From Swiss-Prot:
Family listed: Belongs to the paired homeobox family. Bicoid subfamily.
Keyword Hydrolase among record annotations: no
Superkingdom to which the source organism belongs: Eukaryota
Official protein name in the record: Homeobox protein goosecoid
One GO molecular-function entry: DNA-binding transcription factor activity, RNA polymerase II-specific
Native source organism of the sequence: Danio rerio
Residue ranges of the annotated DNA-binding region, renumbered to this chain: 146-205
Pfam families xrefs: Homeodomain
């Protein structure tokens, strides 16, 4: 078994986007991402971990020994009973509109929204064996975005970047490449840094402008109040 079978990269690489979630009706299969045959070969060792219940759904074709349709591969997932998945049945007070397994707008609990699962993790699964919490966790695992690697700049790199930013807010490609070689960074990292730095600079400029306007309004208001007080004193003196 490959050591990297369950690494984060291998798991995330096999996942389609959350937009590929499909609405499954009772006795319908769950759609798996269009993975390479090598993944299916490696996943064969895990077929015994999950029960394969029921016959394949109609209108499905066999592709290389796998059940497939429209460039998707299918693993059997059956909703138990016409009343909905087990997660809804476990809590009698939850109707089809309240159960998180059922998308809003569907009036039948016999349909359930399940996100595609990487085939190398789960060949076959029965929704009746999963609780509502497990279904939610499965969907969160699929939809969770991969975190981007954040670059940590050294003091020397930041100083060089800031110095160039004071000279020009929009350095051209050649200037960015020259600076990147100087501080041992990729040009793409320098470009992103300048993009973020310009956004910060605009926020600071806007904040400073708002503070200046507020200060002017306050000074004008104070001046008007002082003038009214002086006018009041003058009126009192004239009356006396």
């Amino acid at each position: 078994m490959p050591a990297g079978m369950f690494s984060i990269d291998s798991i995330l690489a096999g996942r389609p986007s959350c937009k590929d979630s499909v609405l499954l009706h009772r006795n319908a299969p769950v759609v798996f991402s269009n993975l390479t045959e090598s993944l299916y070969t490696a996943a064969g060792d895990f077929n015994g971990l999950y029960s394969h219940t029921g016959p394949p759904a109609p209108n499905l074709q066999s592709v290389n020994g796998r059940i497939g349709y429209n460039n998707y591969y299918y693993g059997q997932l059956h909703v138990q009973g016409p009343t909905g998945p087990a997660c809804c049945g476990a809590i009698p007070t939850l109707g089809s509109q309240q159960c998180p397994c059922i998308p809003t707008g569907y009036d039948s609990a016999g349909s359930v929204l399940i996100s595609p699962v990487p085939h190398q993790m789960m060949s076959y699964m029965n929704v009746g064996t999963l609780s509502r919490t497990e279904l939610q966790l499965l969907n969160q695992l699929h939809c969770r975005r991969k975190r981007r690697h954040r670059t940590i700049f050294t003091d020397e790199q930041l100083e060089a970047l800031e110095n160039l930013f004071q000279e020009t807010k929009y350095p051209d490609v050649g200037t960015r490449e020259q600076l990147a070689r100087k501080v041992h960074l990729r040009e793409e990292k320098v470009e992103v840094w300048f993009k973020n730095r310009r956004a910060k600079w605009r926020r600071q400029k806007r904040s400073s402008s708002e503070e200046s306007e507020n200060s002017q309004k306050w000074n004008k208001s104070t001046k008007t109040t002082s003038e009214k007080i002086e006018e009041g004193k003058s009126d009192v003196d004239s009356d006396s």
